[in-house]
Amino acid sequence: MLLVLSASPYRINKQASRYQITRQFIEQTGISIIHTNLVGGQDELVFDGASFAMNRQGELTHQLGEFVEAIELIDIHNNQPIKTELAAPQLPIASIYQALCLGVKDYTRKNGFPGALLGLSGGVDSALTLAIAVDALGADKIKAVMMPSQYTASISLKDANEMAELLGVELLECSIQPLFDQFLLNIESDFQIPSDSTASNTMTENLQARIRGTLLMALSNHSGSIVLTTGNKSEIAVGYCTLYGDMAGGFAVLKDVSKTLVYALCEYRNQISRVIPERIIQRAPSAELRPNQTDQDSLPPYEILDAIIEAYVGNNYSPEEIIALNYNEADVQKVIHLIHRNEYKRRQSPPGVRITHCDFGTTWHYPITSSYKIWST
């Protein structure tokens, strides 16, 4: 019998890969195996435990739980574990959610933060981040901050308040409008930049995000709590985020979670208990930085965007191979261009839980400065 002492980090569907490798070893050697695995979060990595044993026939005889420390006695006969009744495995979506919770819990706790702060916008990303934070740390350790502007819809305020009530979280509200107006006055008077010019659109949108980031960091400095950022992998991939704005914080909970997976996780969490108002999930996503704005003004629909990102980043497909999958050439070209153009933003993003085999981290190696062009035309 072989005892394996492992520190194998979680990835989506990683356990199936562990089973396969173990059975291949047993088939080659005829040796039964007890595979023990580390549990806990370490920076971007989450170790899921899920220790198990297999007999010489490659049958699973013992299976410990995921994301929890556990001790189990194993009866051994003839140098192999005696088979026991196994609990039903978790759904993959449940494992993903637990990985995110454990990552937040251990990063916050092990680094000595007394709690966490986040900006609650009334949108789906901040809603999921808040749910994860509360499940990880407890409602008494979390403060949510709503920072509306003239572009914030009234239903965003209502939904944010409802969610805070459902989770029992303290919700602070601070309008950024006075600060935003004063910034624009100073910029116009000191730098002669008219705030209503077309060229100023990006400036005024990013300015709102940076005011919010500054307020959150001020609260963090006052309380000692860590700021959790709420951007998802889809946005970070194509740069649909603001440096020193919504990217400002200490830990990026959804850094490796695509937008389509965000929706699936919201639905999963609400199946346990209703904590995210349905309207948050059903509304068209919007940064609410200008009138009547939606994400799809700037990006392809998320189901298309995420599929292209997964093909290019996750599966290492060429642009031509992605187009051959019946994706629009213009969409493919735009997404790949944005991925490489925004490398500089990703380099400055905070760490976050890694759940996939390619998270723009250790397995992604592209320079910021390069004249290389993906497209020849």
What positions do the PLM features span?
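CN hydrolase (nitrilase-like) catalytic-core segments centered on the catalytic cysteine
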Residues: 1-68
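Short gly/pro/ser/thr-enriched loop/turn and capping motifs at secondary-structure boundaries
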Residues: 10-12, 41-43, 68-70, 152, ...
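ATP/NTP-dependent adenylation/nucleotidyl-transfer catalytic domains that generate, transfer
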Residues: 30-31, 56, 83-121, 126-377
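Hydrophobic residues at beta-strand termini and immediately following loops
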Residues: 36, 64, 74, 174, ...
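A short, polar/charged loop-to-alpha-helix boundary motif
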Residues: 67-84
